[in-house]
Amino acid sequence: MDRFVSIAGDPHIGVFTRVFDDIAVVPPDVPEEVTTRYEEALKVEIVRTTIQRSPIIGSLLVGNNNGLVITGMATEEEIATLSEYRDLMLLEEGMNAAGNIILANDHFAAVHPEMDEEFMDALSDFLKVPVIPLTLGDVKTVGMAAVATNSGVVVSPRTTPGEIQRLEQVCSLPVGKGTVTMGNAMVGTGLVANRYGYLAGVGTSGYELGRIEDILGFEEE
């Protein structure tokens, strides 16, 4: 299967789309030829919407099988669309680009280290997972420096051994370093994945795909 895809010619598919085990949330104007690739590779239902009237879905949405977290600036129509699939938590104040500042799966969530304890407690209650503050190689936007599924976590190659150890302790899953699109360390910008499969931005090398498959537990094709 061809694992390479772009959104309007842009390989940063993790910025524009967000994938879960059952749905892929994409901008309304993504062509059917692209959404078909998502359906086939990831076994998902396609949900078309903007968030905050913006196409950068991946930067503004995050969550797990228990709930979705989005910017509080989402419109009523956007909230109604997403509410059909999960309960929603709205980030009303401060940093609200949820997909940038939160990394989450059904085992854990890691957040921008400047988020306060009250927020972390609320997020933990909502997603039903332990929440830790974290940087990945000194990058605070952990949601774009890594990709987490319920099978493994791909992190930036700049991630320190201590940061990897902390992730392994909180999620009890394989954690490994990887890149996309020929050396992009912000793997969350160019990779989407779930328990069934993955897609990477156009330009990702075969070696990079091999690392992704190894960490997330997919057999090489």
Curated annotation (Swiss-Prot):
Organism this protein belongs to: Methanospirillum hungatei JF-1 (strain ATCC 27890 / DSM 864 / NBRC 100397 / JF-1)
Alphabetized NCBIfam families for the sequence: eIF-6 (TIGR00323), PRK04046.2-4 (NF003132)
GO molecular function, one term: ribosome binding
Record's keyword terms, sorted: Initiation factor, Protein biosynthesis
UniProt-recorded name of the protein: Translation initiation factor 6
Keyword Protein biosynthesis: yes
Function comment: Binds to the 50S ribosomal subunit and prevents its association with the 30S ribosomal subunit to form the 70S initiation complex.
Signal peptide: none
Family from the record: Belongs to the eIF-6 family.
Keyword DNA damage tagged: no
Matching HAMAP family: eIF_6
One BP annotation, GO: cytosolic ribosome assembly
Pfam family, one: eIF-6
